[in-house]
Amino acid sequence: MIFHILFNYNQYNKVMDEKIQKVLEEKIRESTSKINEITTLVNSFGQMKNPNVFGHGIIIGRLYNSFYYQSRRILKRNPTEQEFSEFIQLLKKHENELLEISFS
């Protein structure tokens, strides 16, 4: 019950800066359009048990780096826990789109 209340509270009281959210949405589009670059990077490590996990890790890492960097650049501070929670929700919103990408 309390999780439901907190989750709904977080949905209606967005604190993530709109500029940061815009940058992240663009970075998601950019990452999904640069599959060839990421695939080349993944393949440069030779035989991997699961290249998709590594490729998705690269994308998530790029997005996390952008989130953190833009928070520091635009807001002049580290992101708050609530902003980080909104970042996670943004990733979940694009989860299917990101998981459809294959790097093998």
Indicate residue ranges for each PLM-predicted region.
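Short, Lys/Arg-enriched N-terminal segments with co-localized hydrophobic residues
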Residues: 1-15
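Non-transmembrane, amphipathic alpha-helical segments
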Residues: 16, 23, 48-55, 83
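Short terminal alpha-helical segments
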Residues: 12-44
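Charged low-complexity stretches with an acidic bias
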Residues: 72-104
